[in-house]
Structures are given as C-alpha cells and as structure tokens.
Amino acid sequence: IKAALESKLFDKVVVSTDDEKIASVAKSFGAEVPFLRDKSLADDFTGTFAVVKDAYQKLKDSFSSLDTVCCIYATAPLLKAKHLQEAYNLMQNAHAKSVISICEFPFPIQRAFVKDDNGNLSYREPKFAPMRSQDLQKCYQDCGLFYFYDKSCFEYAKDYQSIGYAMPRHRVIDIDTPEDWDYACAMAKAVEELKLD
C-alpha cells in the first residue's frame, strides 16, 4: 500500500479481500476497500488474474477512466515506489498490454538436476551439461510482486503479450511461511544498512 501510494501513479489504491480484519488494516494504511471479495474467489486455487478481473469489473463503472490496473501482492514488503514507476513507464514506452515483475534465476536453469525415486541425479537437459554457465541464455522467473494490465486484457483480449520488468534480486522474496517473513525482515535491514539500491 505504501509503495503504491508513494508512486503517485494511481488514482485509487484498492485492496481486494474477503476478510473484514484485513480490510480494516488496509484502510488504516490509506487504501480503499469498496467491496469484499466473493468467497468463490478467495480460496487457494483461484488464480490472480480472476481476482484482478473481478475487481476491475466491479470498479470500472465508478471511474471516469480506468485504463490501467496494477495488482500488487500483499507479500511484497521490499517493493518500492520507484519499481512501480519504472515498470509503468516501461509498459507505456513499449505500448505493452501487460508487465510482469520478473527476476533472473540465480543459477542457469539449463543445468538443473532431477532426482529419480532412488535419489539418483541426472541433468534435466543433458545437452547443456558440458557448457559453461556464462554461455547459457539468461532465464527469468515471475517473482510474484506485481503485474500491470491494460484494460483490454480484461475486456476482450484473450491472448496478450507481456513484457518483463526485472527486479533486483535483493528485493524479491516469496513469503509463504513465518521463516520467509523473518528472512524478509533481515533482508530489508541489510538492504538499508548496505545501501544496495
């Protein structure tokens, strides 16, 4: 919420949740919660796009112009306003329909191993085994921090091209457990003390 507000990109910062307590906390930090999310969209199996599309459908009539939507995950504590600004500018300059926050894999995925039932390792892609890691193509992953969407993604585009905004690795943490949260706190402190940005 803080990064979104500080970015000055958004007319409104809206939180989609099915939980009254979360709604209350979101409001206390300056977000709006004009509706509670339908329970059918609040399980562990519903994809992000369905949730964002639902929010877009509910909000589009209350805006004079709702051209771009940004979904920011609640589990992105190291996200800064400048990342949102840079990603939005990238989207505008590239005339893209969508921007995904990405980060480079820390190791070449072409040299990944798989284990069989006995624990024996084999290369997932053996043809890359003899190659130097610096000669392999860089690969990126969706780092699950934020997504920008043009409104056409919700209204009529079934297939749209996305471009990636590469986040610094020290700003990317996937928070699923209390240990992940502790790691995020330690990383935030390190980023601040070492002035990594």
Task: Give the ranges of each region predicted by the language model.
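Short phosphate-binding loop-to-helix
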Residues: 14, 20-70, 78-82, 86
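N-terminal glycine-rich phosphate-binding loop and ensuing alpha1 helix
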Residues: 1-16
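Short beta-strand/turn micro-motifs composed of small residues
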Residues: 17-18, 73, 102
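Conserved core of the sugar-phosphate nucleotidyltransferase
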Residues: 47-50, 68, 77-169
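Short, structured coil segments at secondary-structure junctions
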Residues: 9, 29-31, 117
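Short, high-confidence coil segments that cap the C-terminus of an alpha-helix
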Residues: 10, 64-66, 93-96, 191
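Hydrophobic helical membrane-anchoring modules
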Residues: 166, 170-197
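Short beta-strand scaffold positions
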Residues: 16-17, 148, 175
